Amino acid sequence: MAEEKRSAEEKKMQKDIVVSYRNEKEGKGCRGLLVAFFSELLHPAVSGNKSAEFRALGAKKSMPDLAYIHDGKIYGIELKMPDSNHDRNHIIEQADVMATYFFRGYFVWSKEILWNILDAIERGQPIMSNTLQVKDYCLRNSTTKVSFEKIIRELF
């Protein structure tokens, strides 16, 4: 039950961010493009027997929630609620995907933090990726679940 609530909260945060981006930044000096991935469609609990179909259409496991495309570079953005708990291995997979396929990747827990990242990218001074820090934290912890609140407190 808490899993479903957290997922709904993360979806609400994503929706709020995308709508705010369109209203506040898109076409108003911001030259980048914010797009979404829907990796959750690959989970049978979400899409039932259609997960194989979504995979065949190009959906990839562990992709970040959003991507920001700017000046030919793609930045991965994975949204996490500050008070959420996640499977340690899944966070590691998400960090690996962002480190492998994206120019830079970011775990983000608020709209304000994302705006700071996007503003820095727009200025040509992108903030260092935090994916490897988060991955290293997860690798140092032997628990199966990690608290994102604890990650924020200890790393940032």
Where are the regions that the model predicts?
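Catalytic phosphate/metal-binding cores of nucleic-acid and nucleotide-processing enzymes, i.e., regions
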Residues: 1-156
